[in-house]
Amino acid sequence: MSRTIFCTFLQREAEGQDFQLYPGELGKRIYNEISKEAWAQWQHKQTMLINEKKLNMMNVEHRKLLEQEMINFLFEGKDVHIEGYTPEEKK
């Protein structure tokens, strides 16, 4: 049975995560406040960010950068800036 939460990213009720996806207090906050739909949007942005900036997840500084971008995107309403990327226009 799925959980319904108020997603702070989407600003509406949505299906919550099945389990905590990220460690620590930030992971608890994501579990309680971020829906599956919002998390999928973040994963798409995260993949683009890792590829475009050639981030190495073995590098602590790169992981810190990615975590800060995640916080900015999910909780502070800031979009991820990827140089040279222009989003498709919605019709």
Curated annotation (Swiss-Prot):
Cellular component aspect of the GO annotation: cytosol
Pfam families cross-referenced by the UniProt entry: Iron_traffic
Gene Ontology terms, MF aspect: iron ion binding
Domain of life: Bacteria
Entry keyword set: Iron
GO biological process terms held by the UniProt record: cellular response to oxidative stress
Cited function: Could be a mediator in iron transactions between iron acquisition and iron-requiring processes, such as synthesis and/or repair of Fe-S clusters in biosynthetic enzymes.
Quaternary structure, from the entry: Monomer.
Family note: Belongs to the Fe(2+)-trafficking protein family.
Official protein name in the record: Probable Fe(2+)-trafficking protein
Organism: Citrobacter koseri (strain ATCC BAA-895 / CDC 4225-83 / SGSC4696)
